[in-house]
Amino acid sequence: MRQKNKREAEDVTFELGSENVFADLGLENADGLLANADLTHAINTEIRARGMTQVEAAERTGLTQSDISRLGKMKTDRFSQERMQNALRRLGMDVEIRINRRADGGPGTLKVFQPK
């Protein structure tokens, strides 16, 4: 008889999360963390779309090659949102900031909308 491995033997349940994994994990500044991740993703996507090396991307964005490497690994701890926005602009991307009043009067959120 075949022995079940531990994964097969356990009942696994899933819970639907929100659109923000950082909020689901209970982290402080979850909106800011998600915005940083989205900005980093946009930088990495544009670098790949252009077929740039890390050195070429560094020259274009004004960042260092090691900065580009860190962003490629989604390590955002050394980067302000302003610095990432500037890198995107230097890559030829428009960065728009839109402010809306919440209908329910609750605290606002911070979101990054990327082109599809």
Regions found by a protein language model. Name each.
Residues 75-81:
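Short, solvent-exposed alpha-helical "recognition" segments
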Residues 1-41, 105-116:
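N-terminal flexible/basic segments that precede or flank functional cores
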Residues 69-72, 85:
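Key DNA-contacting residues within the recognition helix of helix-turn-helix
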Residues 81-98:
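DNA major-groove recognition helix of helix-turn-helix/homeodomain DNA-binding modules
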